[in-house]
């Protein structure tokens, strides 16, 4: 048994307290605890504590320190359960204590993967042009379950996805593209697929926001590609065969047969 003889607040952290006990005729430092543990365990001057009690007090203090670490981590933004668990492991917290803290945070609704997923999707929709498949991937990387992700994605309807793609396409209209209208559309389609939109959503958006080069710009692009193809094949082919090679090259670039014939007949 040991008797607590003195309790002092720490100079650098007024939420932690140093506990002193009587030993060999004098006061000696025994351990320190968080204020929450001090109150919960009823620590006070004159209290007798045995080795088992001290062990429990120190365990509670480790739990509280880990809880405080998690709260600090959560103070910057919402996190998934997986993110908090990973963070605490990196801080060398023990597994049983981590699970204890995660359970406590969840009970207090400070951790909620469904709320996190919904907030994550809402923020990304407002600040980026990412589609549902990309958002699903990013949430999975944060350890959110597929069931939870699917539930949260119901807030991002098909119609809203189409509208978001249309808004993105409108922004692309003012950009310069040296190529055919078809090649431009294909390039934008690839970008949208990479952003996480499905083909049906993309096609519906294109139907409402047609992507087409100005005729003069497309004609200039065709001539540039045509001249390049002519130089490439001129040393190998002549006459009709040369024209066919150039025609094939331009067709692969997405130019219409009508424009290609016009170029070759000029």
Swiss-Prot record:
The yes or no answer to whether the keyword rRNA-binding is present is no
- Where is it located? Cytoplasm
Q: Species name for this entry?
A: Halalkalibacterium halodurans (strain ATCC BAA-125 / DSM 18197 / FERM 7344 / JCM 9153 / C-125)
Regarding protein family, the annotation reads: Belongs to the RecX family.
Name this protein carries in UniProt: Regulatory protein RecX
Gene3D superfamilies the record matches: Winged helix-like DNA-binding domain superfamily/Winged helix DNA-binding domain
The entry's function note states: Modulates RecA activity.
Q: In the UniProt record, which is one GO cellular component term?
A: cytoplasm
Q: Give the GO biological process terms.
A: regulation of DNA repair
> Is Cytoplasm given among the entry's keywords?
yes
Supply the Pfam families for this chain: RecX_HTH1 (PF21982), RecX_HTH2 (PF02631), RecX_HTH3 (PF21981)
Q: Which UniProt keywords apply?
A: Cytoplasm
Q: What is its main location?
A: cytoplasm
């Amino acid at each position: 048994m040991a008797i607590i003889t003195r309790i002092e607040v720490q100079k650098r952290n007024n939420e932690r307290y140093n506990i002193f006990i009587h030993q060999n005729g004098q006061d000696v430092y025994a351990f320190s605890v968080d204020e929450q543990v001090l109150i919960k365990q009823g620590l006070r001057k004159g209290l007798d504590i045995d080795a088992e009690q001290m062990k429990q007090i120190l365990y509670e203090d480790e739990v509280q320190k880990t809880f405080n670490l998690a709260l600090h981590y959560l103070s910057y933004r919402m996190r998934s359960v997986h993110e908090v668990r990973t963070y605490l492991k990196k801080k060398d917290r023990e597994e049983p204590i981590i699970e204890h803290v995660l359970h406590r945070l969840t009970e207090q609704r400070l951790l909620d993967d469904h709320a996190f997923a919904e907030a994550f999707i809402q923020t990304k929709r407002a600040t980026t042009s990412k589609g549902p498949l990309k958002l699903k991937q990013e949430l999975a990387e944060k350890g959110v379950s597929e069931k939870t992700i699917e539930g949260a994605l119901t807030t991002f309807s098909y119609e809203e996805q189409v509208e978001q793609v249309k808004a993105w396409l409108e922004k692309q209209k003012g950009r310069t593209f040296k190529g055919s209208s078809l090649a431009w559309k294909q390039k934008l389609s690839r970008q949208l697929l990479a952003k996480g939109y499905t083909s049906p959503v993309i096609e519906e958006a294109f139907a409402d926001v047609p992507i087409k080069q100005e005729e003069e710009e497309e004609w200039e692009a065709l001539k540039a590609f045509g001249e390049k193809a002519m130089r490439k094949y001129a040393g190998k082919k002549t006459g009709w065969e040369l024209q066919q090679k150039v025609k094939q090259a331009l067709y692969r670039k997405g130019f219409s047969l009508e424009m290609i014939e016009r170029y070759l007949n000029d």
